[in-house]
Amino acid sequence: MYLRRFYFIILVYANLKMEYDTKDKTFWKRKGNDMKVLLGAVNAKYIHSNLAVYCLKAYAEKYGDTSDEISIGEYTINQQLDEILRDIYKRKPDMLCLSCYIWNLTYVEEICREIKKVMPQIIIWIGGPEVSYDGVKVLERLPEVDGVMKGEGEQTFCDLLHFYQDK
């Protein structure tokens, strides 16, 4: 547990401008209202569904102790990139978390690059088997991404929500 949290902080610190509270000895970035979080999945086919994003949402709602608004957006690799970007933009999330697999990695990377152009303040996190094995290299390759979730994501996602929530 401690090692995972240490790794989590390293990845966050690598790409975010953060403040340090010397009194509490804690880091924080966001203050204010609850966030709108979009869990995104790019599936191989229209009939497929991404179990990971539903598990993350269910776990966060049950154990997360957060009032952030969490929604799910499922897309397919057959959809036009503009259509996906338009949907994300219409939802106006503060944070976008994307699930990465071998069949959607290049598409997810393109989404990250393009959505950051139209929504520069959006926080982008990615996770899944195609990116969690070497988060540092992924962050170097994708400067638009703010962090990589490693391993089982449920508790890490809750930690992430708390990280951005008011202290």
Give the ranges of each region predicted by the language model:
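Glycine- and acidic-residue-enriched helix-capping/strand-helix junction motifs
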Residues: K45-Y54
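Nucleotide-activated donor-dependent transferases that construct or modify glycoconjugates
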Residues: K36-K45
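Glycine-rich beta-alpha loop elements in corrinoid/cobalamin-binding modules
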Residues: A52, Y59, D68-K167
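Short hydrophobic alpha-helical segments enriched in small aliphatic residues
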Residues: A14, D21-T22
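Short hydrophobic targeting helices and cationic amphipathic motifs
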Residues: L3, Y7-L11, L16
